[in-house]
């Protein structure tokens, strides 16, 4: 007999304020004062974190937008330079890979690596894809959508990452 395991009522009720820490990406970012408050962190659950003080785009989490005329991905890669990033399109997917070797920072030595894969909508014009890195470390991958009668063209190719001198205009939803 299968038994459904449910969280206690207070965890279910406060779920939106304490999202799961399973997918946290705050490696090496340090602690905030609210991380150290025992009545907020340990009484609810060690697997939940208060996320009211961080914006989605400031946390390393990507934002994907797909409207009528374009497809855009915003990704915070502030710890990487354009030389550390590889963006390629393979069939219906865009793959973004970032890696920098061990380097010294304020607290010792650190190396970072990530790999993201996103499915492209079938009507994105793959010959007009672009990718840029803003001065504040926001990677913007975008491509226009084509009308339904045209072929979007699917092949594997690398997309160069260009550097912008101004900060990103991505909203911090």
UniProtKB/Swiss-Prot annotation:
Keywords: Acetylation, Chaperone, Cytoplasm, Eye lens protein, Glycoprotein, Metal-binding, Methylation, Nucleus, Phosphoprotein, Zinc
Entry-linked SUPFAM superfamilies: HSP20-like chaperones
Reported modifications of this chain: Acetylation at Lys-70 may increase chaperone activity.
Glycosylation: residue positions: 162
Residues with PTM Deamidated asparagine: 101, 123
Pfam families the record matches: Crystallin (PF00525), HSP20 (PF00011)
Ranges of biased composition (kind: Basic and acidic residues): 153-167
Binding residue positions for Zn(2+) 1: 100, 102
GO molecular function, one term: unfolded protein binding
Similarity comment: family membership: Belongs to the small heat shock protein (HSP20) family.
Protein name (database record): Alpha-crystallin A chain
Organism expressing this protein natively: Phocoena phocoena
